[in-house]
């Protein structure tokens, strides 16, 4: 069995990752595969918190939101993340993984509100905690929510699951000579103008000395390898 390099981690999942090959919504086989990977990591004894996006259902900055009040559109996006969190919780339940959802928006009949001491207790008890509704405020992305919650719970690293297997010197889909960085500092990312997270989220991680690992969620076993400290994806360090 693989060993863990981190005791407590924050996993950022995009809503789009749940679509799989579909154009919208939640692809069942994709969410089942993701929960297999999450369950495998939880079995290592890693304290795992997850922030999930809502882009597979609605995004405040998407073309469909054009003409809408930005705050209203962002609140709709937050509610989309709650739907995704419930779907992920249900799928994890079927794997026997004890999971709690905490929302930054109060919907008491559906999910419990975000309360930091409770979240910490759940993690210490070995439960997976899913943070929904972003930060609870418009104009902030779920990347920023991941950085914020990661800092609040004392995570040792933010694991950003994407469609590419790390940070490259250029777009690998356009430039065949693009190379993947195994490790890169926060300062180097800024100098090279590489895209990792939105500026607010990136600055928060940098200020809190919270490393980020970017890896592909579509690569089998990548999450476990990232948690085990293997050469998977790209590590952004201080």
UniProtKB/Swiss-Prot annotation:
Reaction catalysed by this enzyme: UMP + ATP = UDP + ADP
Signal peptide feature range: none
GO biological process, one term: UDP biosynthetic process
Record-level Gene Ontology MF annotations: ATP binding; UMP kinase activity
Keywords (A to Z) from UniProt: ATP-binding, Cytoplasm, Kinase, Nucleotide-binding, Pyrimidine biosynthesis, Transferase
PANTHER family: URIDYLATE KINASE, URIDYLATE KINASE PUMPKIN, CHLOROPLASTIC
Annotated family: Belongs to the UMP kinase family.
Protein name as annotated: Uridylate kinase
